[in-house]
A protein has these predicted regions:
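Structural detector for short beta-strands of small beta-barrel domains
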Residues: 2-23
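Beta-strand secondary-structure signal
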Residues: 13-15, 29, 57-59
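OB-fold (S1/OB) nucleic-acid-binding surfaces
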Residues: 20-41
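Short nucleic-acid-contacting surface segments enriched for D/E, G, S/T with interspersed K/R
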Residues: 42-59
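OB-fold/S1-family single-stranded nucleic acid-binding modules
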Residues: 61-92
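Acidic/His-rich, divalent-metal-binding segments that scaffold phosphate/diphosphate chemistry
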Residues: 80-198
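Divalent metal-dependent catalytic cores for phosphoryl transfer on phosphate-bearing substrates
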Residues: 139, 144, 161-273
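C-terminal membrane module of polytopic membrane proteins
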Residues: 258, 274-289
Length: 291
């Protein structure tokens, strides 16, 4: 994911493997989020990619020559085809760009401890299945299926972009993204996301740490400072005037912004275009718009 320019719709996530190697070309299979391709490519295009199969980020070119694909991110740690295909199946229709961003941030994560933590979370199929389908609230903001994923992605991207814009360091950008993505993950155990009566009604922040216990424990052993910074993004903020870590401040700010924009959009959802004010039943607030 390019924090500076995220509008390139040509980026795609693909499981790739070599089908056949010929004299001057190679035949590769690309299994993407929604479809598959078999392409003849110059050998240099796929240099460094495991021919047995792995996950990559690709950028498509409209040309039909042997240079039509550019590998923008080589995710060499992910070589389990079954795990990748399971992840693809979890993707709700219309959320493909979110999944690309979620994996694309690996292109910026160079700290090994943080990278291992993040991959451990992404490759937990049971956790991701719950996370992708959950609601962010019962009757407040993003209260639809997949709403938690949409809200968390908004917070992650906006917080990371603010950290980049204010030049607080590449590691802070990554912590802001991951902290924003996971700041509400404990909500999968709240009553409105539970299939049975086992769901609880309470503070989801406590459940953030329960859900992420194993990868957080490993992160603490490998990098106590990053553990502390990421934990500050996941914890309850009561009675604190400011955060010690800037990524946590950005996550908190962007969390509130995402909720507010959702309320604003919902208020105007069924209002005629010529109306410039509307009431949100979600938070009993009047909103105005400029056009």
């Amino acid at each position: 994911m390019n924090i500076k320019s995220r509008t390139n719709s040509a980026d795609d996530l693909a499981w790739v493997h070599l089908i056949e190697r010929r004299k001057q070309v190679e035949l590769w299979q690309f299994c993407c989020l929604r479809q598959s391709y078999s392409l003849e490519l110059s050998p240099n295009i796929m240099e460094g990619v495991n021919p047995e199969g792995q996950l990559v980020m690709v950028q498509w070119s409209p040309s039909n020559d042997l240079q039509r694909v550019k590998i923008t991110l080589n995710i060499h740690e992910v070589t389990d085809k079954a795990a990748v295909h399971h992840h693809f199946k979890l993707v709700p229709a219309g959320c493909e760009s979110i999944i690309i961003d979620i994996w694309g941030i690996l292109g910026l994560i160079h700290d090994e401890a943080l990278r291992r933590f993040y991959l451990a979370v992404l490759l937990n199929n049971e956790l991701m299945g719950q996370f992708f389908n959950a609601r962010a609230s019962r009757s407040h903001h993003h209260n639809h299926a997949c709403g938690l994923l949409e809200h968390s992605h908004e917070v992650a991207v906006t917080a990371a972009m603010l950290c980049w814009r204010y030049n607080v360091g590449p590691l802070s950008v990554c912590v802001a993204f991951i902290g924003g993505l996971l700041h509400d993950i404990g909500k999968i155990h709240l009553f409105y996301n539970a299939d049975t009566r086992d769901g609880i009604a309470g503070s989801h922040e406590s459940y953030n740490f329960m859900v992420l216990a194993e990868p957080l424990a490993l992160l603490y052993r490998n990098s106590p400072k990053i553990f502390e910074a990421l934990s500050s993004c996941l914890s309850v903020k009561i009675g604190r005037r400011s955060e010690a870590y800037i990524p946590a401040s950005m996550v908190r700010l962007c969390d509130n912004l995402s909720m507010e924009v959702c309320h604003w959009r919902t208020a105007f959802a069924d209002v005629p275009p010529h109306h410039w004010y509307a009431h949100s039943a979600m938070n009993d607030q009047w909103y105005k718009r400029l056009g």
